[in-house]
């Protein structure tokens, strides 16, 4: 089919609305929002859909936070995620090197303002969440849907009727965790800040803000990997590299790095890594590696 027609047959995706209103609690980021939603809908909850995120909590996010959220939509099976452009969007693309300039920008702006969702638009599926209900999240298992509040405990293998949850059981065995075990205080061996999910300048700024004046634990190996050369240069221009160096960290060259165990950036078998990446599958960061997905803020703490 592809060789004969130069086309890939695709079905038109369904549309889904995820509306989140209210104000997010302190230290709750777009990554936490993504993990929370996936934990509620499951890793297959968005299968066959294109997801639109909306609501006051979404509008209050920075562009980089919105990118993180849309990036993670694939982790619940969606084809992709989008957010209606607004003034935050327009300001973000006003000054970059390759953005339209002057009259071209104004002409483009008029077109961008037309990219809106009709007030009476219909969706195949709709979900509504309160921002105030979303806590700081972390995964404990082997897919992004196995996420819980960082203050919570690992789920029980058996439900109230005594039936064994095979997915929970398998995840606990691989992760070396037990039912009822607290996630707060869980030992980690590695920390990874980076990936297409959380390797932006805003992520580095947040991480540096928290670790400034502190010292990295000598028992933790940390990889701080900017998402691009542009992010690396911006971090150096802002002095973020100096803050990290004084705290015992260092900026590495941009790339995928430990997100998928690229090159030498591998987590050894049986070791735990808190990671800002988007996937925590078995062996994702190296054979036998154990991954906790979290935000840059949580990773810094």
Where are the regions that the model predicts?
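Fe-S-dependent hydro-lyases/dehydratases of central metabolism
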Residues: 1-301
């Amino acid at each position: 089919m592809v060789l004969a027609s130069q086309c890939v047959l695709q079905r038109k995706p369904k549309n889904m609305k995820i509306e989140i209103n209210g104000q997010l609690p302190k230290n709750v980021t777009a990554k936490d929002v993504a993990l929370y939603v996936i934990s509620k809908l499951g890793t297959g909850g968005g299968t066959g859909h294109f997801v639109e995120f909306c609501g006051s909590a979404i509008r209050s996010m920075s562009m980089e936070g919105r990118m993180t959220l849309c990036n993670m939509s694939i982790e619940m099976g969606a084809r992709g995620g989008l957010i209606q452009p607004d003034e935050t969007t327009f300001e973000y693309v006003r000054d970059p090197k390759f953005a339209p300039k002057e009259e071209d920008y104004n002409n483009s702006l008029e077109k961008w303002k037309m990219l809106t969702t009709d007030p009476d638009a219909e969706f195949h599926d709709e979900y509504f969440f309160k921002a105030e209900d979303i806590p700081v999240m972390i995964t404990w298992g082997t897919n992004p849907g196995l996420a819980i509040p960082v203050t919570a405990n690992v789920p029980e293998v058996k439900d109230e009727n005594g039936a064994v949850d095979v997915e929970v059981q398998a995840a606990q065995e691989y992760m070396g965790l037990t039912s009822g075990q607290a996630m707060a205080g869980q030992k980690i061996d590695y920390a990874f800040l980076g990936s297409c999910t959380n390797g932006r300048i805003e992520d580095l700024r947040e991480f540096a803000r928290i670790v400034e004046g502190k010292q990295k634990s000598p028992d933790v190996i940390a990889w701080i990997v900017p998402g691009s050369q542009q992010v690396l240069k911006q971090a150096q221009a802002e002095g973020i590299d100096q803050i990290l160096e004084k705290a015992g960290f260092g900026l590495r060259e941009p790339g995928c790095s430990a997100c998928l165990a690229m090159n030498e950036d591998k987590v050894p078998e049986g070791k735990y890594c808190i990671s800002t990446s988007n996937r925590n599958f078995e062996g994702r960061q190296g054979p036998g590696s154990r991954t906790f997905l979290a935000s840059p803020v949580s990773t810094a703490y």
